[in-house]
UniProtKB/Swiss-Prot annotation:
Native source organism of the sequence: Homo sapiens
Coiled-coil residue spans: 54-96
The protein, known as: MaFF-interacting protein
Pfam family, one: Tektin
Assembly, per entry: Interacts with MIS18A. Interacts (via its coiled-coil region) with MAFF.
Gene Ontology cellular component terms for the protein in this record: cilium; cytoplasm; nucleolus
Length: 124
């Protein structure tokens, strides 16, 4: 079986070039194979030497992401609570503004007909 790098050599050198090509890509030649069939050395699995460190860093990142998502949910809940409080305070302010308006516009004219407490007490 040919490796992909040697496939082009089989077609061009088949029967003409009996030995392995002078290249550093092929380390050995198996003579029991047909002429022109060369084996490439097995490619090693490339794993970085600091893989455990990277794995631990990824786990730390996942933990950090989880913690940040929890904080985000808490912040969103706090924001919803603050919006509810804001709405209730706006309703209270509107009700008090309406009460003051009613007191000044409707009741004040009626109160001016009667003497004040100070006038009744004789201080004015």
């Amino acid at each position: 079986m040919l490796c992909p790098r040697a496939a082009f050599l089989v077609g061009s050198f088949h029967g003409v070039f009996p030995g392995p090509p002078a290249s550093s890509h092929w380390e050995f030649w198996v003579p029991s194979t047909p002429v022109g069939a060369y084996f490439c050395p097995p490619q090693p699995q490339l794993t970085p030497p600091n893989t455990p460190k990277l794995v631990s860093e990824v786990e730390e990142l996942y933990k950090s992401i989880t913690a940040l998502r929890e904080k985000l949910l808490q912040a969103e809940q706090s924001l919803r609570n603050l919006k509810d409080i804001h709405m209730s305070l706006e309703k209270d302010v509107t009700a008090m503004t309406n009460s003051v308006f009613i007191d000044r516009q409707k009741c004040m004219a009626h109160r001016t007909c009667y003497p004040t407490i100070l006038q009744l007490a004789g201080y004015q």
